[in-house]
């Protein structure tokens, strides 16, 4: 039997370092395995918001304020302070939701959607709101009678009977809360009838970051809010400036038949002013479907979502998603890498919604204009006549793949000048049933000989046909004199 050899000091040190390294790895692994449970440990949550306060003191300053607020699609960095003071006053005002369409809206912060609130888990949010619905809208329009309004934060865990009570015009409500869960949460007015208040524009987003931030680093961060508008021409025939006024159509609202489905409050809202990114960047989109009644299938053409965090919580992770399905008030954070230079179109892949305006563009340095008409990228025409506006929107959503107005023939003729070549009655019959016209009308037969693809029947209503013709007349009257383009 031999005696054991005493290890050298160097060997003893190496062994100690190895044991320390293994011990640290085990501890780190244990911490990581415990961290999800720790994040949702009830004892760490704050359930002491304190009572709400309602006063008769009217605020007359800015309609929205606070370092935690973002006022457009770009999300501002998180403010350092753990105390976030925000103000979101309610107003009745006029917004533009489409070319030639001014809408009598109810708002938070005098915009639709309302400003985005950006906080983190554990922050103390100090909220105040004055009901300013009795203040005249721009141009001294009294759009609707002043009324009660309230605030419902989905990010808060509070007694709604206290915090979400309705206040009268001129009153001010204030309360505090602490967000206990990360996510992308809706806020909205909760005053009956809630449906009408949300459909009139009273909604927005609260982004609650995890205590320790997100597991990835994004190069670009944008907030996308999908919502519906249900409109009809103002029965009093008022206008906002030179733009006809539209008001809420309660019948369409109850039938779930929206006139527009939009991103960030505007028809094709981020097309003329696209979001910006660069090839190779990680883009993070905070997406909320505010409804009030429809579903969204959010998709970015040319991208695959590397990570999807349902409801905006990184613990609810999916990978490699093509489309995210969101019900009313549902949300997700989606991330993707921009693969190369180009224009990336955001759409609701329920294309009936996309045709109503749920379209946007992420411009990643496209070198030339792309032909993406089938995603409803709009032309530049902006009529103000209500029927011409509807005709324009229908033309852009259904016709741009085959026709232009002034940019030359495609699969079908350039339609600029069509009202100078054809009578309204001929156009009415053509739009009602092009397939029947081709077999019976000489002019239609000539078109069929010139263009090999016959236009299929579109099943248009009489009202839709009238709107198309009004739009064609507007385009022909607005264009510079030139030779008719259509044979």
PLM-predicted stretches and their roles:
Residues 120, 425-429, 451-484:
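C-terminal capping alpha-helices of c-type cytochrome domains
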Residues 86-207, 293-326, 344-362:
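Histidine- and aromatic-enriched segments that form or immediately flank copper-ligand environments
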